[in-house]
Amino acid sequence: MSNKDYKKLYLVTDYRIPFNELLEKTKEALIGGVSIVQYRAKNKKTKEMCKEAKELKKLCDEFGALFLVNDRIDVALAVKANGVHIGQDDMEVSIAREIMPKDAVIGVTVHNKEEALKAIKEGADNLGVGALFSTNSKDDATLMTLETLREIKSVSNIPLYGIGGITPYNLNKDILENLDGVAVISALLNSDNIREKSKEFLNILSK
């Protein structure tokens, strides 16, 4: 198996955690093997977001990890992030592609095959698929069936990252065979030992 074939562990930050604490937790996750970090901040001022994103980008650069910003293309551009992740209610992928640098990574959250096909056609580089399990991070998350996940996999030629309530204990073979990695928040950031929890995830993803 080549490096590009390894399933990836993707951390999404939690804006409810004080930033200095979040920075330290993110570092532990990166040491543990996280290879993608998405900065997600709600109800924060742009100046504060830019400051935080800049520090996280610097940290990700130290570990050779990809750094993405959720929703806010302006913040992503300001801190020279590697890309953005956008949802169904955000800017169209095609417009984001025009604004972002040519080599920028654009991820999109999708919930069904139709949304996946549209995102791929418009130039998405990866898809966040879910929610696979119930989650406290997004109140309005609708659970995705295994059948829907398989439908998306069947039409996708770009990486798929599972999202929503994922832990090392609820991932099974049927789910994993349709994913290229998983994106997590609470399962890592609420762990007593983030570094070891990251390694635990990667061990499961490597099977």
Swiss-Prot record:
Major enzyme class: transferase
Catalytic activities: 2-[(2R,5Z)-2-carboxy-4-methylthiazol-5(2H)-ylidene]ethyl phosphate + 4-amino-2-methyl-5-(diphosphooxymethyl)pyrimidine + 2 H(+) = thiamine phosphate + CO2 + diphosphate; 2-(2-carboxy-4-methylthiazol-5-yl)ethyl phosphate + 4-amino-2-methyl-5-(diphosphooxymethyl)pyrimidine + 2 H(+) = thiamine phosphate + CO2 + diphosphate; 4-methyl-5-(2-phosphooxyethyl)-thiazole + 4-amino-2-methyl-5-(diphosphooxymethyl)pyrimidine + H(+) = thiamine phosphate + diphosphate
Stated role: Condenses 4-methyl-5-(beta-hydroxyethyl)thiazole monophosphate (THZ-P) and 2-methyl-4-amino-5-hydroxymethyl pyrimidine pyrophosphate (HMP-PP) to form thiamine monophosphate (TMP).
The entry's keywords: Magnesium, Metal-binding, Thiamine biosynthesis, Transferase
Cofactor remark: Binds 1 Mg(2+) ion per subunit.
Cofactor: Mg(2+)
GO molecular function: magnesium ion binding; thiamine-phosphate diphosphorylase activity
Protein name (Swiss-Prot/TrEMBL): Thiamine-phosphate synthase
Originating organism: Clostridium perfringens (strain 13 / Type A)
